[in-house]
């Protein structure tokens, strides 16, 4: 087993290697609209949360290795950090078709329903399974405007 990351670059590479999404965590400077991140402020490292342009500092660390250990544990324990959306639509039949495909491929998924003007069905796969289904989002993700 690989040792846990000690630097932002190592944490970023670990996320890539394990197919984590980059939507909710800003590690090593990637842009996010909403979520958690690491920022260096002088000699300190700040763990923050940002939403709608408002950034709130949550924790302060003296060393890079301390904040990386903290971030690594947070990311590892966040089931959403490893999800990839492969379906977003309003058609239950189309959603069921997608679930059947994923089941036949023996791919674990998470499916939920959210109110989005009308009921929208979202389907996610985990981690590196996204590499097995790269063609599915083109067919099963609709524009929210539909």
Regions inferred by a protein language model and the residue ranges of each:
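Negatively charged, low-complexity tracts enriched in Asp/Glu with abundant Ser/Thr
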Residues: 1-26, 78, 132-144
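Short, structured interface segments
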Residues: 58-79
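Short aromatic-glycine-(Arg/Gly/Cys) micro-motifs in beta-strand/loop hairpins
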Residues: 27-56, 74
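Short, solvent-exposed secondary-structure boundary motifs
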Residues: 17-33, 98-108
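Conserved aromatic
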Residues: 5, 61-62, 89, 127
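Intrinsically disordered, low-complexity charged/polar segments
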Residues: 78-108
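Short amphipathic beta-strand starts and helix->beta connectors
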Residues: 69-73, 103-111
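Structured core of small recognition/catalytic domains
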Residues: 113-146
């Amino acid at each position: 087993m690989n040792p846990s990351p000690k630097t932002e670059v190592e944490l970023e590479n670990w996320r890539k290697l394990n197919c984590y999404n980059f939507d909710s965590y800003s590690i090593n400077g990637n842009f996010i609209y909403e979520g958690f991140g690491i920022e260096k402020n002088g000699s300190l490292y700040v763990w923050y949360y940002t939403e709608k342009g408002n950034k709130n500092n949550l924790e302060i660390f003296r060393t890079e290795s301390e904040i990386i250990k903290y971030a690594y544990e947070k990311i590892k324990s966040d089931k959403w950090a490893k999800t990839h959306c492969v379906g977003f639509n309003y058609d239950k039949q189309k959603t069921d078709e997608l679930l059947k495909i994923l089941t036949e491929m023996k791919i674990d998924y998470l499916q939920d329903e959210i109110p989005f003007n009308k009921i929208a069905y979202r389907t996610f796969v985990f981690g590196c399974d996204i590499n097995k289904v790269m063609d599915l989002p083109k067919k099963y993700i609709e524009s929210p405007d539909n």
